[in-house]
From Swiss-Prot:
Name of this chain's protein: Adenine phosphoribosyltransferase
Coiled-coil portions: none
Protein purpose: Catalyzes a salvage reaction resulting in the formation of AMP, that is energically less costly than de novo synthesis.
Entry's EC annotation: 2.4.2.7
Top-tier EC class: transferase
A GO cellular component entry from the record: cytoplasm
PROSITE patterns for the chain: PUR_PYR_PR_TRANSFER
Record-level Gene Ontology MF annotations: adenine phosphoribosyltransferase activity
Family matches, as InterPro entries: Ade_phspho_trans, Adenine_PRTase, PRibTrfase_dom, PRTase-like
Amino acid sequence: MKQSLEDTLLAAIRTIPDYPRPGILFRDITTLLGDARAFRRAVDELVHPYAGAKIDKIAGIEARGFILGGAIAHQLSSGFIPIRKKGKLPHETVRVAYSLEYGLDEMEMHIDAVSPGEKVILVDDLIATGGTAEAAVRLLRQMGAEIVAACFVIDLPDLGGRAKLEAEGVDVRTLVSFEGH
């Protein structure tokens, strides 16, 4: 009997209690990435709605968004944009500041990574509060990109990130949800 996509993914995602600090349940997709069947099913499911669409670029958020985004870009025959923390890219960059729980951080991409009007899908492994994804959307829009969607394997709906992105007019696609944090 074929296992459902949700069951396959939930079985492949490891939960680590009290990481990176007490009270947090860390959802680790490295086990999913190591499971060839689960990894393929996740990527195929994220790609499916956009197959045949003209998607110019996939933007992946450091670091797990690079892995998923690279696979998605390959399947859609799209270019790939790495979005990284400040100071990690070698060429001239454009950056945006965003709030973290305990302060500010900055993310950036190369200034020539996207052209105005290009259709872009944003990819990361998980959406929690949405702060990082929202900053990435602002960064891409600042350069004139049209955000087609933001795709994540995991949604933590209790933390409100999906709703935050949808309020910004972003179509959000997730594959599985975990209650709590």
